[in-house]
Swiss-Prot record:
Keyword Transcription attached: no
Organism name: Rhodobacter capsulatus (strain ATCC BAA-309 / NBRC 16581 / SB1003)
Subunit structure: Homodimer.
Cofactor(s) this protein requires: FMN; Fe cation
Residues in coiled coil: none
Protein name: Type A flavoprotein fprA
Residue positions binding Fe cation 2: D102, D186, H243
The UniProt record lists the keyword Metal-binding: yes
Length: 435
């Protein structure tokens, strides 16, 4: 199948990801796709870090099951990863936990390549699959399944749990007891793209997890509560959602977290790690390059959790809880008409509603003529009682290789200030004004 190439917007940071499948558990592989450039999902939801379309292959002694697929534009990535772990004639089962297009874009072609496969989904999903396949629907072994039913792969079974309206009528979960993996599709998902895939390896995605819940699951919270009741007795060790990080570290915490989100927000903790959030807006990609370099430098510290956000793709309000809990923030902006861009000022204005006193602050950006934006942002950060241990970093036009290294060094210094490895220092108003 011919799939058009996908090009990331120049202003978006490119997150390196796996080129092949990724082992999730014995006999279980991630075969999905990364979409780091996505900035708006389903019209209603901004995606500052893009998203992932998680699909999985499960191997048993008598065949392979494929659980969900990907958005059509990324079918090529999906098939390449799937072919690395299975032949098409080995595919015995295709499980569709949810029929939304971002999970079924490769289904027609997958069935063409593996026509012998059984297709199992919730009964409410049958009309939607018929609409997707049109006249081809009758060609395949397609059946609805309900809670408690299962399909054997020989030495392991996949059991189904009907969880309607989480967030479509057709949604279900699939349980692999042999490896304690629960495939939940949109439940426990988040629009957060990070090529490291697992929740114990990626950046801080709490904001995305909660924002996703607020925008997608909250209108169906009574159904979410019923779904949690249904799956809570399972002894799962991994939650494998269809979007965002795979939850292999303390997965039950996310169930508890979701219960709390049904009625109230959860103030999560990051343990002994320090957290640095980097927000930026980029006109021609130069500030984005600088932001990525600062991120990479700071991320070299094992004691600092660093997250990078493109504010062009996100609303500001969902970030406020995250900023309030963070130890430091760095803001990047180009200089346009002698000023920082509007989105950065909107974020700075929103910070008056949260506690910022004593947090580490920093500013950076590219410019063409005068370069006042960094200085103006620094002044406002000081007005918010944040501490600025490093003078802001400015680059004229696009950064050179040497200037990108300066960005990485800037990030390393910010991390050192957060962890106490650097001597305390405070940039004062006179130093800012002098620039």
């Amino acid at each position: 199948m011919s799939v058009p190439p996908f090009t990331i917007r120049p202003a978006a940071p490119r997150l390196d990801g796996p080129t092949g499948p990724v082992a999730v558990a014995p006999g279980v592989h991630w075969v999905g796709a990364l979409d780091p450039g996505l900035r708006n999902f389903d019209v209603i939801l901004k995606t500052a870090n893009g998203t992932t379309y998680n699909a999985y292959a499960v191997r048993g002694s008598e065949g392979v099951a494929v659980i969900d697929t990907v958005k059509a534009e990324f079918a090529g990535d999906f098939f390449a990863r799937l072919e690395a772990v299975a032949r098409y004639d080995e595919i015995r089962l295709i499980v569709l936990n949810h029929l939304e297009p971002d999970h079924t874009g490769a289904v027609p072609e997958l069935l063409r390549r593996a026509p012998q496969a059984q297709v199992r989904l919730s009964p409410r999903g049958l009309p939607m699959l018929r609409a997707l396949l049109k006249d081809d629907f009758e060609r395949y072994d397609i059946k609805g399944v309900t809670t408690g039913q299962s399909v054997s792969l020989g030495d392991r079974d996949l059991q189904f749990f009907t969880t309607p309206f989480v967030h479509w009528p057709d949604t279900q979960c699939t349980w692999l007891a042999a490896e304690r993996v629960l495939f939940t599709c949109d439940l426990f998902g988040s629009h957060y793209c990070d090529g490291r895939l697992f929740n114990d390896l990626v950046g801080d995605f709490r904001f995305s997890f909660e924002y996703y819940f607020d925008r997608i699951m909250r209108p169906f919270r009574s159904f979410v509560a019923q779904a949690l009741d249904l799956i809570e007795p399972l002894d799962f060790g991994i939650i494998a959602p269809a979007h965002g990080p795979i939850l292999r570290s303390h997965p039950r915490d996310y169930l508890t977290h979701t219960r709390r989100l049904i009625s109230s927000r959860l103030a999560a903790e990051t343990g002994s790690e320090k957290t640095l959030l980097i927000f930026y807006v980029s006109a021609y990609g130069a500030t984005a390059q600088l932001a990525q370099a600062i991120h990479d430098g700071a991320a070299e510290s094992p004691d600092v959790r660093v997250s990078l956000f493109d504010l062009e793709g996100g609303e500001i309000t969902p970030f406020l809880d995250l900023i309030e809990e963070a130890d430091g923030i760095a803001l990047g902006t180009p200089t346009i008409n002698g000023d920082a861009v509007r989105t950065i000022w909107e974020m700075l204005a929103a910070l008056v509603d949260i506690e910022t006193r004593g947090k580490l602050g920093a500013a950076f950006g590219s410019y063409g003529w005068s370069g006042e934006a960094v200085r103006l942002v620094e002044t406002r950060l000081q007005g918010l009682k944040m501490r600025l241990p490093e003078p802001g970093l400015r680059v004229k036009l696009h950064p050179s290789a040497a200037e990108l290294e300066e960005g990485r060094a800037f990030g390393r210094r910010l991390a050192d200030h957060l962890t106490g490895r650097a001597a305390p220092r405070e940039v004062d108003f006179a130093e800012i004004a002098a620039r």
